[in-house]
Amino acid sequence: MQITILGSGVIGVTTAYYLAKLGHEVTVIDREEGPAPETSFANAGQVSPGYASPWAAPSIPLKAAKWLFQKHAPLILRLTTDPVQYRWLLQMLANCTDSRYKINKTRMVRVAEYSRDCLIELRKDTGIEYDQRSQGTLQLFREQYQLDGIGKDIEVLRQDGVPFEVLDRDGCVNVEPALAHAKDKFVGGLRLPNDETGDCFKFTNALAKIAEGLGVKFRFGVNIKSLLMSGGKISGVETSEGIVTAERYVVALGSYTPALIKALGLNAPIYPVKGYSITAPIVDESRAPVSTVLDESYKIAITRLGDRIRVGGMAEVSGFTDDLPAARRATLDLSVTDLFPGGDLKAATFWSGLRPMTPDSTPIIGGTRYDNLFINAGHGTLGWTMACGSGRLLADLISGNKADIRADDLGIARYN
């Protein structure tokens, strides 16, 4: 089939790759001049299925109220005049129950674990390189109450068969030796040995080249204006370079997905939640991480990417903003300096990206009420973690193949 994919981030490119492998004729359209220049450009770098947890958790309402008054809060709420923001926040609050948390986390871990397996298989098949490491991730707890409160997450990990280790201070230092100098800064950790790390931008660009070798065509610098309808189905995409037609269409536009499909009467409650990162060259190996360490207090991930340290995190609900506040940079600097002062922060680059978040933190993967329109968006903070699995899953659904994992609860129908 002829298939047009809108969006060339990591989700769009992985979808294109898997569709091409199944023999489809694929075209990818994006307004940017190359793959992954926005949200996929400088994310935290970890592929962490076991840490796939909803932001909408039972404890979040109370924590959010406290964070409003903290200088280095992991969640920042900047209210706008946009009613969409308020509706999204209310929907998120509705998911902050024990029952919804378990349902959402189970769905997220299902997609994320499958995606990690798909990534490993893709790497074996292609030999793709992207500063990859397979040395697990460590969630670091600075306070005892944080360590004491991981029971619900461990329950889900056991239920899903995800290996884990609860570590004391010495155990944390054993897997991340550079933490030896900071043993007084934490009480313990939760380690997931099967998690990985890697540069999402490098991966996406390398995979785009591999996809081109499979026949995928990329049309960059093309603005997407609207989806056209005829006879109850999508008949084309109106772009700055004319109308593009295909047999099937995939919307993989991250936070911009709702605006495109709204005219079709489709509701995708995806809202941009801004994240920040810095990337610094390593100048002291003995004080740099081996893999990824998640600083639970600040919700920040510190990741080793080759000869660089990537420090990323926080969640700012402020709409489509691209500013780089000094206060956010200060929080990133504080966390990494405290734990892994092996990078040259003076030479670091500062970045922000808009994570496409759904109220339940679960991505939208699947078809719509229009037979030839599909969506792959809303992965939030886990686009890199879920990319390969999401792309392969949707490719199977479009092709009429039996999916490897359950997909009926991932579609847009849960909102419409």
UniProtKB/Swiss-Prot annotation:
Protein EC: 1.4.99.-
Broad enzyme group: oxidoreductase
Function: Oxidative deamination of D-amino acids.
Identification of the protein by name: D-amino acid dehydrogenase
Gene expressing this chain: dadA
Pfam families hit by this protein: DAO (PF01266)
Gene3D superfamilies: D-Amino Acid Oxidase, subunit A, domain 2 (3.30.9.10), FAD/NAD(P)-binding domain (3.50.50.60)
Cofactor needs: FAD
GO biological process per UniProt: D-alanine catabolic process
Organism, as annotated: Brucella canis (strain ATCC 23365 / NCTC 10854 / RM-666)
Example of a GO MF term: D-amino-acid dehydrogenase activity
UniProt lineage: Bacteria, Pseudomonadati, Pseudomonadota, Alphaproteobacteria, Hyphomicrobiales
Binding sites annotated in the UniProt record for FAD: 3-17
Catalytic activity line of the entry: a D-alpha-amino acid + A + H2O = a 2-oxocarboxylate + AH2 + NH4(+)
